[in-house]
Amino acid sequence: VLSSDPFFSPAQSTGERLPYDEVRMLAPILPRSKVIGVGRNFADHARELGNDVPVSPLTFFKPNTSVVGPGEPIRLPAISEEVSYEAELAVVISKIAKNVTPENAYSYVLGYTAANDVTLRDIQRIDKQWSRAKGFDSSCPLGPWIETEYDPENVRIRSWVDGELKQDGNTEDFIFDIPTVIAHLTEVMTLLPGDVILTGTPAGVGRIEAGNRVDIAIDGLGVLSNPVMDLSLIHI
């Protein structure tokens, strides 16, 4: 067991060891500031939803209250009848970043983890902007860990619902690569340590409902698994 804030102090060992099957994994990062998503960053995904391929990164925000960890339920709000999974590679920022060039963008990255950009698809169509559709509580599962020694440029991204393969893409098919996205964002905003960037989902998104389990696997980053539950059945 380690105790620290990874952004402001070195990790300290407590000397305690716990069996993996006796602990509950939390989200590996809870952003103090923001989660930023990149929409339609795979051409095949843009086409499957009937959208044009963007000419510059299409970005949106998710609040930090949307973040949950491995094994935690995706809680379906009553306002939506069409909820979708979206498997994504997440980038965790290591230090303050402003006006970053693509050439040095990777020096601002702490590491990478898996993400599920859960979306209320019907609300997304109704609202025209995405705050409610992508910002509801539990709409951003992250985990199971942050990998700091990692090459994200040719990585397989897959998702399953109840064991059935739904998505199978690769980061080499990004429209906008990670350095381009970081440079684009920092032209107008400051990224802070612990900020998370969701880099887009490949084709194959679809509906989930209460009782399903969604598994997200990204090469080298383990499996992020979350059950899907009706919000009315969960007492907070």
Predicted stretch roles:
Residues 53-70, 85, 215-219:
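Structural signature of FAD isoalloxazine-binding scaffolds in flavoprotein oxidoreductases
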Residues 30, 37, 84-86, 192, ...:
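Residue-level recognition of short, solvent-exposed, well-ordered loop/turn junctions
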Residues 45, 51-53, 121-234:
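Catalytic-pocket segment enriched in acidic/His residues
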Residues 70-90:
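A structural-propensity feature for long, helix-poor, extended segments
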Residues 1-57, 150-152, 158, 164, ...:
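N-terminal non-catalytic cap/leader segment that marks the start of a structured domain
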Residues 98-112:
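N-terminal accessory regions of nucleic-acid-interacting proteins
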